[in-house]
Amino acid sequence: MNIYVRTNKFTAGPPAFVTQEDLLALRGARVLGVNPPVRDFAFMDLWSKPLGLLYLLQSLRAENSVALLDCVWEARAGLKTYGRQKTAKHEIEKPAPYAAVRRRYFHFGPAREEIAAKLAEMEAPDVILVTSVMTYWYLGVKWIIELLREIFPAAKIVLGGVYASLCPKHAARLGADYVVRGRAEPAAPYPAMDLYGAIDYGVSMTSFGCPFSCGYCASGILWPRYRRRSLAEALAEIDCQAALGARDIAFYDDALLLGKEEFFYPLCRELRARYGGGLRLHTPNGLHVRQIDERCAQTLAESDFKTIRLSLESIDPEIARESSGKVARGEYAAAVKNLRAAGYAPEDCETYILAGLPGQDIRSVKDTINFVWDNGGVPKLAEFSPIPGTPLFEAAARKLPALRSEPLLQNNSVYCSYFSHDITPAELQELKDMTKRRL
């Protein structure tokens, strides 16, 4: 029977918007999930997996056959630390908006011929689910949609993910048949990581959304409601990936330590009991330093958290307000002191510092960098990316209206130093040099 008739959504016609609920109504379909290649000046595998797509494929597999093509994973080119992979790349022509940017531009992923050969080996799908992440990575999304259309002309292509949620009208122009509007909590208890076979690392979200409302962050747009998963749910997600061989787990949470007495400490106790140090844990998204007292720091160390990222953003009071006032100077100093006492080295206490925000004084960035050094941490520059729908995007777009129509201009690698005119490339390099000067 025609699956498109049965779902009452997947019918012929111009690009239309659908929801996750529409996709979950699929029955008897051959479904292919695709994570596109990345096109950008730089890309690093910080335990990067298309988690939303993997949750969806897990939900669909009970009533459909599912397969996965992860173009980033297919381009793995050697192991780095803690299960991460180097990603193969080749230089490509820069798109017109980047013509003045004096940097090389790359395709991170297999070449066209390699992906085409991989797709040719697959059974033709009925529905292809293409995910997306950064808004300024849409050229890789467009590229893979065109290739998929060429190889599987009869398949219906559905575009979802972060970019599609933040820029739905722009996403509707990339050639997909349908665009997923909005986000929803996963219907599956864990992601379909087994589609990779054996894995070196796993990923986990113990909560969805964030209780804070930072002016630069899209978490509240993507997840309007903050919800903490149960301890049993979080453990089941980690267990299923450890069973596939993962010895490293990266937490994607925006607020992992919130409510630590009720959730985080019990989670750590149970992981130690189950794995006895057999799992290494990582927090690439940054921890709220206000929560890191002596007990918390000791728990992190005892539970084998290897990658600690701290969220400071700025010691400038104006910038701190845009960060929901998550941290004060004394709280940061105390957090680093507690981590050092628990056995962490300075290089283990990398601290995110924002640079390039609308109206931000470069002197405040320098002051924050020096403050981190003076208190025993290691500064890590986080260049501002104007994300559609956030208050600071609106502030940036008033100065650069083209941000509203061209997502490439939202790229954090080049926005603040080439497009915002708030900071020059030379000044940005000076800030980067300051973050390395004491190592």
Regions found by a protein language model. Give the residues of each.
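Glycine-enriched alpha-helix->loop->beta-strand junction motifs that scaffold or abut catalytic
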Residues: 175-176, 301-307, 374-378
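Charged, glycine/proline-rich intrinsically disordered loops and linkers
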Residues: 75-113
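Glycine-rich beta-alpha loop elements in corrinoid/cobalamin-binding modules
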Residues: 38, 56-75, 102-192, 389
